[in-house]
């Protein structure tokens, strides 16, 4: 009962936050113009696991500087100050005056997963990986066996440092990345590189279909730190768009779980799928909109082994204050094939400016 009062008090306090202007500040600096914006996400997370901590914390505190030198050269610098630490997120220079072909150099998201490529300012699932504090045991990646947990910890998705190309023509768009493979703000550990590619076809104004391929290089310590490569591939579909009625994102991915090797250093095969459906209804008055949502996720870290997969069901509700500024709650329900069901209740406020 005490936790319920905390949840309700926090949610009501979030809804009392005044509207926030979303126009970015534009300034001039030397030979460039700079637009400054940012986001601040404050979260409360409570787990059903007995020895887990229930925690208030700042999930994201990011300032974004979008820099324009001319029609050919743009850049972004995005530091994150969450939890009292400084970590660079997007930091890149982008070259190109045509939407058909552009080159990025720096740190950015790999060209792979639809949920990772979707901004946290748009997503209404509070945590992509549906983490439940106090739960572990997913083969190779620890934590829970969920869609984003697998592809993030196996480094097929998330940010990395390197080179990216992207573009679009008609109904087709593409992006490809060549990166270190070690992740955000980390130097390379070998001479190998990781590759990712993604192609999207806009079947209609509201429906898009995509296919993606990722090749990740890693070190095998038991083989003298020799370099090997894991491969993952998948397809996804998106119906609708953000904050406009029905919106659905669904994906299926299969590949090598290189963090789970057998005695001959062969990778296990993982399989994961996820669908997130939401419906945004515009409102008048204090609230700009209301959005209920539902996530279904399955993660199997080793398809050759029985009863080691897990499922996630996440009902949620978001209250929009203005634009992308919102507050809401998710209940992540994790059910492993072997073990007890665990819950994580999360409330988060999203400030976008």
Please describe what each predicted stretch is.
Residues 1, 17, 127, 328-330:
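Intrinsically disordered, low-complexity peptide-like regions
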Residues 1-8:
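Bacterial N-terminal signal peptides that target proteins for export
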Residues 17-23:
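Sec/Tat signal peptide C-region and signal peptidase I cleavage site
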Residues 25-184, 189-196, 200-209, 274-282, ...:
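Outer membrane beta-barrel
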Residues 48-51, 70, 94-96, 104-107, ...:
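Outer-membrane beta-barrel pore domains
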């Amino acid at each position: 009962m005490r936790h319920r009062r905390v949840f309700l008090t926090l949610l009501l306090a979030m809804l009392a936050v005044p509207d926030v202007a979303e126009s970015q500040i534009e300034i001039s600096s030397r030979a460039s113009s700079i637009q400054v914006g940012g986001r601040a996400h404050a979260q409360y997370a409570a787990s059903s696991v007995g020895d887990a901590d229930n925690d208030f914390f700042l999930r994201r505190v990011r300032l974004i500087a979008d820099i324009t030198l001319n029609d050919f050269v743009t850049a972004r610098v995005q530091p994150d100050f969450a939890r009292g630490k400084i970590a660079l997120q997007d930091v890149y220079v982008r070259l190109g005056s045509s939407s058909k072909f552009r080159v990025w150099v720096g740190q950015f998201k790999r060209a792979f997963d639809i949920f990772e490529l979707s901004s946290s300012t748009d997503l209404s699932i509070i945590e992509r990986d549906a983490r439940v504090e106090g739960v572990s045991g997913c083969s190779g990646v620890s934590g829970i066996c969920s869609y984003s947990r697998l592809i993030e910890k196996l480094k097929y998705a998330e940010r990395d440092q390197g080179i990216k190309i992207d573009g679009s023509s008609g109904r087709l768009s593409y992006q490809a990345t060549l990166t270190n493979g070690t992740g955000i703000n980390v130097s390379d550990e070998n001479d190998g590189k990781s590759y990712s590619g993604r192609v999207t076809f806009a079947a209609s104004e509201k429906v898009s279909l995509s296919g993606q391929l990722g090749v990740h290089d890693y070190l095998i310590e038991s083989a003298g730190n020799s370099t090997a490569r894991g491969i993952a591939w998948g397809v996804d579909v998106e119906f609708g768009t953000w904050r406009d009625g029905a919106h659905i994102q669904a994906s299926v991915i299969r590949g090598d779980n290189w963090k789970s090797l057998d005695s001959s250093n062969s990778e296990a095969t993982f399989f994961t799928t996820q669908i997130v459906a939401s419906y945004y209804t515009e409102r008048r008055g204090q609230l700009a909109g209301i959005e209920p949502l539902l996530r279904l996720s399955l993660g199997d870290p080793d398809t050759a082994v029985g009863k080691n997969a897990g499922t996630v069901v996440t009902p949620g509700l978001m209250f929009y204050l203005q634009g992308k500024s919102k507050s809401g709650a998710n209940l992540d329900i994790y059910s492993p094939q072997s073990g007890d069901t665990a819950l994580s209740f999360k409330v988060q406020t999203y400030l976008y400016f």
